[in-house]
């Protein structure tokens, strides 16, 4: 970052751990955000897109001359990829979606969030993406009455199969179940 010109932009690919680990990494995050305000965006990438490692990675975008000084953009692109046998791949559409989201800085539910610096301070400079981008999916409600009916039907089918099986076992001279 020191080598970056005053109007330069730098993007760094790192493992997700740098977003939330404590100790010196936490101190560095706080310094880069609170003291210098260089961090412009955090982009979460899918796991297994880089050769030789399956860990999820992220891109940190730094700018010394930020246009949006009061917030940081969080993008969760971890679900947008083409699965591969040995390695996952970002498609052109996936990359374009990231770029367009970065340029527009518009909130998209379950994909990106523009977090004010106060929110990041409240989270003690922990940049873990799920703290900022809610990706929780509601589970479908289970109708207990339907499940009970299914269980009764299945029990009845099992009883019929057992009855038929006992006929065959009896014919073979074997003990019934």
Identify the residue ranges that each predicted region occupies:
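A conserved structural/catalytic subdomain of Rossmann-like adenosyl-cofactor enzymes
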Residues: 1-177
């Amino acid at each position: 970052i020191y080598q970056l010109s005053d109007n330069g932009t730098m993007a760094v690919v790192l493992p997700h751990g740098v977003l939330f680990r404590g100790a010196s990494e936490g101190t560095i995050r706080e310094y880069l955000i609170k003291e210098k305000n260089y961090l412009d965006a955090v982009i979460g990438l899918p796991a297994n897109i880089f050769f030789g490692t399956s860990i999820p990675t992220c891109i940190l975008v730094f700018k010394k001359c930020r246009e949006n000084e009061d917030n940081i953009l969080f993008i969760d692109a971890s679900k947008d990829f083409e699965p591969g046998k040995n390695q996952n791949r970002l498609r052109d559409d996936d990359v374009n979606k990231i770029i367009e989201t970065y340029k527009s800085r518009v909130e998209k539910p379950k994909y990106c969030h523009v977090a004010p610096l106060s929110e990041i301070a409240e989270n003690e400079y922990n940049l873990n993406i799920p703290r900022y981008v809610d990706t929780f999916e509601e589970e479908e409600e289970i109708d207990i009455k339907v499940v009970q009916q299914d269980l009764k039907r299945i029990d009845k089918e099992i009883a019929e199969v057992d009855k038929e099986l006992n006929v065959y076992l009896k014919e073979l001279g074997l003990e019934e179940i």
